[in-house]
Amino acid sequence: MSGWKLGLDGFVTHFMVSGPQEEPYFNEAKDKNQLRYEAYLRSVIAEHKPVGETGEILVGAKSRLNEEWKYYYDSGSCFVNISTFYSVMRHIHFDIATVLETSSDIDVTAALWSYAAVDVYCNGRLEGALKQPVYKPIQKKELTLHLKAGRNLIYLACENLGVRDTRSVAGLQILNHKDEIKVSIPDEACADAAAVAEAFLESA
């Protein structure tokens, strides 16, 4: 079985990312308390639309968000982080994809970490979700991934409210069966090139 080992504490560290897709956001609610107002908007913004058919997840190909897929590399970081500052409100969507490889069918306990609302799919099946975004602290939710022998597509559909300093961050931590899992990405050709580039960078 090829692929990368899990990172520190069982975190997945290799991903493909599409987005962010940013759309203007308006809500008629009003509140003089800015933090309370933002908390309310976060409680209602997430739509959790079913992902459906993802299409080919290849570098440069368009995702369901009509944004290109990119390989995400951050030198072993535990999280995908595409945070930025917003001067006007935006509804943010971004998708994350990775592959977990195993030699046998296993049920894996995982922890999803994010400030965003996230739906987690394993081979097209919804396995769990964070229902709404938060400003802080980061959210954590344990869920079960039903892995089949071979390559398993893990797909995170993320939504966030873009307002001021917005934390668009997500991570996936494997809590058991760590020695039985290798990590890859959906674009196998890119995975080979990424492995070579990563080895070069880490040897410098």
Protein language model regions, located:
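Residues that act as N-cap/strand-start positions at coil-to-secondary-structure junctions
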Residues: 92-94, 104-106, 114, 137-139
